[in-house]
């Protein structure tokens, strides 16, 4: 979580609230449990969440300008890749900091393709960088464990991806790890702006940042941060929580001196809500040496319940079709020539649809087809790297990397 001046925050918030949504969507009415959603929520593992937080705090620091943050980036990329998610990419960006053009680690984006509305995206994310503003010294050697801020949120996104990557959905899902949040929401701002510039249809953005601290003796609460324009999206969240965890207090809250990546999406015209621990009694240990498991993350039950609800909300909004996926090894597909520049041939199972996506996740070509060998005209595509995706007659999904000269 980023802290900054209250006056600047209120000025920025006023500007944010004037923005208009790029797209309008209806949200599900959740008045009774879906047994499939409940089954997925029940599979959320405290042990898995704990292991992720423990691993992330084991890096000396995840500060944006240190070598270690690149190691975390690569670890996230490899973790998503092992899940078999359709597309995993590194989103690179540059930014001005202290009047100097800077680079840092990339945003890590994993995209799971929807089968019915692949161009509509449900996005969830958490920043993976950390910061220590208390201990003096060389940034490369000052520990910034960042357990609650924000290994806890990252663990929730990874756990959501671990379970939902085995399912099929109507809409596409993006699981995101943001870089450089602690110095101004830099990574998420770059990505959200790029999405808006390309008119990417984001149905809603869920942000997890600090979900593991519960003050001793205080009743557990989930506080939601959102602007009034996003009340319809927030109402979906309230209703979902009431249906699936009625004992949990869920209400709107604000922090006078802090912000997080949901604001990047608000600013660019997308509905976004931040799921957070108690806004008046959040961890006092963030940005210090003591942001560690057992001190700053002291309630794995809270982290588990927040993640369960987050997973269920994402799955419901994405439109759960089935709770298992069939084998989608790229060996089932042959593409030649690859790299290509004009026409190419796709061979595989009995195909009914071929789609091509750029690395932003946008669909740039779609062909309805029948047969196990299809010729495809790609002369209109700009040079670059793409993902070719095939849906067969049994609704199995296969993907393969495609290079256009």
Show which residues each predicted segment covers.
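Short, glycine-anchored, charge-dense loop/turn motifs used at functional sites
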Residues: 357-364, 386
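Residue-level detector of functionally pivotal "anchor" positions at catalytic/ligand-binding pockets or at interdomain
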Residues: 319-336, 342
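N-terminal capping segment at the start of a domain
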Residues: 21-70, 210-213, 245, 282-291
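Bacterial Sec-dependent N-terminal signal peptides
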Residues: 1-25, 323-325
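C-terminal tail/sorting-segment detector
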Residues: 19, 383-405
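A non-catalytic alpha/beta surface segment that caps or lines the substrate-entry region
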Residues: 51-113
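Active-site-adjacent substrate-binding region
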Residues: 90-91, 214, 218-322
């Amino acid at each position: 979580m980023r802290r900054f001046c209250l006056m600047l925050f209120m000025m920025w918030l006023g500007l944010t609230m004037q923005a208009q949504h790029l797209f309008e969507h209806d949200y599900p009415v959740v008045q009774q449990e879906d047994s499939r959603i409940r089954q997925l929520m029940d599979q959320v593992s405290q042990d898995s969440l704990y292991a992720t937080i423990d691993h992330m705090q084991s890096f000396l620091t995840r500060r944006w300008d240190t070598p270690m943050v690149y190691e975390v980036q690569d670890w996230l990329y490899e973790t998503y890749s092992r899940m078999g998610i359709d597309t995993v990419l590194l989103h690179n960006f540059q930014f001005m900091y202290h009047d100097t053009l800077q680079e840092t680690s990339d945003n890590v984006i994993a995209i799971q393709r929807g089968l019915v509305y692949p161009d509509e995206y449900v996005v969830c994310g958490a920043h993976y960088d950390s910061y220590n503003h208390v201990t003096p010294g060389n940034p490369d050697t000052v520990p910034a464990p960042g357990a609650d801020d924000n290994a806890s949120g990252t663990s929730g996104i990874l756990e959501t991806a671990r379970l939902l990557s085995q399912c099929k959905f109507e809409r596409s899902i993006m699981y995101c790890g943001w870089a450089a949040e602690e110095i101004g929401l830099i990574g998420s701002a770059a990505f959200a702006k790029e999405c808006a510039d390309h008119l990417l249809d984001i149905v809603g953005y869920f942000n997890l940042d600090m979900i593991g601290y519960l003050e001793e003796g205080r009743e557990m609460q989930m506080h939601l941060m959102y602007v009034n324009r996003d009340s319809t999206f927030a109402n979906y969240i309230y209703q979902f929580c009431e249906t699936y965890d009625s004992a949990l207090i869920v209400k709107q809250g604000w922090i006078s001196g802090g912000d997080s990546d949901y604001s990047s999406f608000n600013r660019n015209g997308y509905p976004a809500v931040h799921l957070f621990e108690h806004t008046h009694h959040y961890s006092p240990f963030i940005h210090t040496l003591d942001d560690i498991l057992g001190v700053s993350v002291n309630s794995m039950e809270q982290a588990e319940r927040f993640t369960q609800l987050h997973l269920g909300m994402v799955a419901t909004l994405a439109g759960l079709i089935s709770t298992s996926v069939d084998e989608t090894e790229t060996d089932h597909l042959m593409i030649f020539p690859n790299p290509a520049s004009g026409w190419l041939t796709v061979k595989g199972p009995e195909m009914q649809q071929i789609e091509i996506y750029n690395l932003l996740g946008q669909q740039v070509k779609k062909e309805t087809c029948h047969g196990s060998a299809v010729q495809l005209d790609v002369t209109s595509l700009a040079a670059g790297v793409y993902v070719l995706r095939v849906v067969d007659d049994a609704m199995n999904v296969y993907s393969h990397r495609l290079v256009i000269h």
